[in-house]
Amino acid sequence: MDIAIHHPWIRRPFFPFHSPSRLFDQFFGEHLLESDLFPASTSLSPFYLRPPSFLRAPSWIDTGLSEVRLEKDRFSVNLDVKHFSPEELKVKVLGDVIEVHGKHEERQDEHGFISREFHRKYRIPADVDPLTITSSLSSDGVLTMNGPRKQASGPERTIPITREEKPAVTAAPKK
């Protein structure tokens, strides 16, 4: 018995879901663009593919991103956690690593039900004392963790260079 194999990128006229990639285009828990509400255009080509998500408007690329900064006097990490309340977040330091965990159980939003969970780890630089790491959550949902960098012991000083009259190498090279 022969079995027909249907490739998802080939348009099938009687299949009601003409854009198989739309399931993977869902940004779960995020707001929708107008183009997300319309079926994918098959009038251009039967092989039309939706543009990749990284080509979306810049407002879409701020979700879940983190930024690690090592400045002259401090180390800081900024993490977008706008979908989590302070009670749903945990920040802890284990050795030289900051661990961030966020989890919220299933709840209803405007698109249906959603649950989220993430784990992030950040290595603390050697010149930052793990005991000095602090964290705060801004009103727009950015979690900031930072700590001061240790300053070099003592002030900076210039070392003078003296000139000697005798050579550094006293033995003649062997032949």
Swiss-Prot record:
Residue stretches in coiled coil: none
Main localization category: cytoplasm
Keywords: Acetylation, Chaperone, Cytoplasm, Eye lens protein, Glycoprotein, Lysosome, Metal-binding, Methylation, Nucleus, Phosphoprotein, Secreted, Zinc
Positions of glycan attachment: S41, T170
Domain sHSP: 56-164
Residues where N6-acetyllysine is found: K92, K166
Region listing for Disordered, in residue ranges: 139-175
Gene Ontology MF: a single term: unfolded protein binding
PROSITE patterns xrefs: SHSP
Complex and partners: Heteromer composed of three CRYAA and one CRYAB subunits. Aggregates with homologous proteins, including the small heat shock protein HSPB1, to form large heteromeric complexes. Inter-subunit bridging via zinc ions enhances stability, which is crucial as there is no protein turn over in the lens. Interacts with HSPBAP1 and TTN/titin. Interacts with TMEM109; in the cellular response to DNA damage. Interacts with DES; binds rapidly during early stages of DES filament assembly and a reduced binding seen in the later stages. Interacts with ATP6V1A and with MTOR, forming a ternary complex.
Function: May contribute to the transparency and refractive index of the lens. Has chaperone-like activity, preventing aggregation of various proteins under a wide range of stress conditions. In lens epithelial cells, stabilizes the ATP6V1A protein, preventing its degradation by the proteasome.
Name this protein carries in UniProt: Alpha-crystallin B chain
Protein's gene: CRYAB
